[in-house]
Curated annotation (Swiss-Prot):
Task performed by this protein: Activates KDO (a required 8-carbon sugar) for incorporation into bacterial lipopolysaccharide in Gram-negative bacteria.
GO cellular component: cytosol
Family membership noted in the UniProt record: Belongs to the KdsB family.
Entry protein name: 3-deoxy-manno-octulosonate cytidylyltransferase
EC class (word): transferase
Matching SUPFAM superfamilies: Nucleotide-diphospho-sugar transferases
Cellular localisation: Cytoplasm
Keywords associated with the record: Cytoplasm, Lipopolysaccharide biosynthesis, Nucleotidyltransferase, Transferase
Highest rank taxon of the organism: Bacteria
Pathway: Nucleotide-sugar biosynthesis; CMP-3-deoxy-D-manno-octulosonate biosynthesis; CMP-3-deoxy-D-manno-octulosonate from 3-deoxy-D-manno-octulosonate and CTP: step 1/1; Bacterial outer membrane biogenesis; lipopolysaccharide biosynthesis
Source organism of the structure: Chromobacterium violaceum (strain ATCC 12472 / DSM 30191 / JCM 1249 / CCUG 213 / NBRC 12614 / NCIMB 9131 / NCTC 9757 / MK)
NCBIfam families noted in UniProt: kdsB (TIGR00466), PRK05450.1-3 (NF003950), PRK05450.1-5 (NF003952), PRK13368.1 (NF009905)
Enzyme Commission code(s) on record: 2.7.7.38
Length: 251
């Protein structure tokens, strides 16, 4: 699958790591490292979407395309919608969202997501991988997704879905054999035309209570195609400790 566009949202504000996109990793800002990884995929174009002039300047200094967006977007998807409009992408263009704090993102995952979206009858696509640890199933910081038999998302939740009623009544320390438990990987692919529609969709109560923006898509009746990845993506950078770990890998 070729010809898709990768958009990397990069905001300067971060509660745990201020100025995160510009954090130095072996002589380059983190957002540039992310863009370099994305460029190893089969994307035709890699664009950073930022709300800060310093990030825009850093991208320009390293030859990375970037666009300046508004600061007041409620979600990353809303920011993508603005970018798709600014780039005048046609409605059938494929847009893959890669987070700006994942300098180790595997290009193969980006390609897999673009391939899924290209062949899907849904306007949104994402990835998941199998969970094998009951502690993760019950962890609200681990987002789970339940799928139908066609590989489309039925629901995303921080709760343990699907819940094995009888098995868990006896023992919650292990996942029952055969229970289809999948962890959502927070990467998305969109058709550009849907992004324009998404910007006008009101948040629903499911999204607000679960704090999961993808539930807005399901709430309004749109489908989300899901492909299973063999492994989780490399860990992103959320804390100073994460940053030091990544710096050691680039040293």
């Amino acid at each position: 699958m070729n010809g898709f566009t990768v958009v990397i949202p990069a905001r300067m504000a971060s509660s745990r790591l201020p100025g995160k996109p510009l954090a130095d990793i072996a002589g380059k800002p983190m957002v540039v490292r992310v863009a370099e990884q994305a460029a190893k995929s089969r994307a035709a174009r890699v664009v950073v979407a930022t709300d800060h002039a310093d990030i825009l300047a850093a991208c320009a200094a390293h030859g990375v395309e970037a666009v300046l967006t508004r600061e007041d977007h409620a979600s990353g998807t809303d920011r993508l919608a603005e970018v798709a409009a600014k780039l005048a992408l046609p409605d059938d263009a494929l847009v893959v969202n890669v987070q700006g704090d994942e300098p180790l993102i595997q290009p193969e995952l980006i390609n897999r997501l673009a391939e899924l979206l290209a062949g899907a009858d849904a306007p949104v696509a994402t990835l998941a991988h199998a969970l094998h640890d009951a502690a993760d199933h019950f962890n609200p910081n681990v987002v789970k997704v339940a799928l139908d038999k066609h590989g489309r998302a039925l629901y995303f939740s921080r709760a343990p879905i699907p819940y094995a009623r009888d098995a868990y009544a006896a023992d919650r320390s292990a996942l029952p054999a055969g229970l289809p438990v999948y962890r959502h990987i927070g990467m998305y692919g969109y058709r550009a035309g849907f992004l324009a529609a998404y910007a006008g969709l009101e948040p629903g109560p499911l999204e607000q209570y679960e704090a999961l923006e993808q539930l807005r898509v399901l709430w309004h009746g749109y489908g989300i195609a899901v492909a299973l990845a063999d492994e989780a993506p490399a860990a992103g950078v959320d804390t100073p400790e994460d940053l030091e770990r990544v710096r050691r890998l680039f040293a």
